[in-house]
From Swiss-Prot:
Species name: Bos taurus
Lipid addition sites, S-palmitoyl cysteine: 10-11
Protein name in the entry: CDC42 small effector protein 2
Domain of life: Eukaryota
Keywords: Cell membrane, Cell projection, Cell shape, Cytoplasm, Cytoskeleton, Lipoprotein, Membrane, Palmitate, Phagocytosis, Phosphoprotein
Amino acid sequence: MSEFWLCFNCCIAEQPQPKRRRRIDRSMIGEPTNFVHTAHVGSGDLFSGMNSVSSIQNQMQSKGGYGGGMAANVQMQLVDTKAG
């Protein structure tokens, strides 16, 4: 027995092409507006423990502009990635 395929073009909608994201180059990016430098934070500051993290948060909040945040309890597990 053979198969017979009949295609109805009127019933099949053409699939929309995915939109390509516009490529951004450096000339499209302007200078920051309303920028306020509040703190220096390095990877060593975060790995020294939770006391350091809370002191960094307190320092940044004392500079202003962080009043709209919400408090959250966070537990972090530190993993040493040094090759030994």
